[in-house]
Amino acid sequence: ACGKDRWRGELDDHSAHISKLSDGKLWEFRNQSRNRLVDFIRERFERQAIVSGLPSEVVEIADQVLDPDTLTLGFARRFVPYKRPDLLLYDPERLVRILTNSEHPLQLVLAGKAPPFDEAGKGLIQKWAQFIQQHNLYRHVLFLSDYDMLLTENLVQGVDVWLNTPRRPWEASGTSGMKVLVNGGLNLSELDGWWAEAFTPEVGWALGDGQEHGDDPALDAAEAIALY
């Protein structure tokens, strides 16, 4: 959806054409985007599993991880404490139940890097790696370590919902969420950065009350529960 040439010049004719598309055709586009993302992730994860020395049984299912027909959430950014990438891990057992619910299937793709000398950020990545391994959730949730522009491009085009959980007011913008929106995805984000201004129920969900609370464990717990 974010090709270059199609967005040059006047956009009025694009709006006219888009408004004529049926809901079925738009959903078809969304399914195609998700399918391409899953294919890309399977190939990327297989290489990662081999290089990282993951168990052979994990490498063997690399071409089967994730489901192209399942609601897919994405979370990709620098892993630093103020972005709270571990907010979903507040209640690990509850998250396991959500991810493995066959009646309402959901899958999660995470990607990111920690700054070179940020031990706290590295610890956040390790928490996710341990969670996935401990509960053998490779078919439902993946962490992709080789975070680059190609991976980001595929994620913003293919995920159904983009997660963003910063501690307000530290989010400067949140441009990845904007890219997801123009690719037909939805946002589930803290009311911070661009989402504080752009949020409307038609295009996603808001997390938090829009106030500044600082480093507050009680608030983190409340927002984690709301996120579930």
Language-model segment annotations:
Residues 1-228:
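Catalytic cores of carbohydrate-active enzymes across secretory and cytosolic contexts
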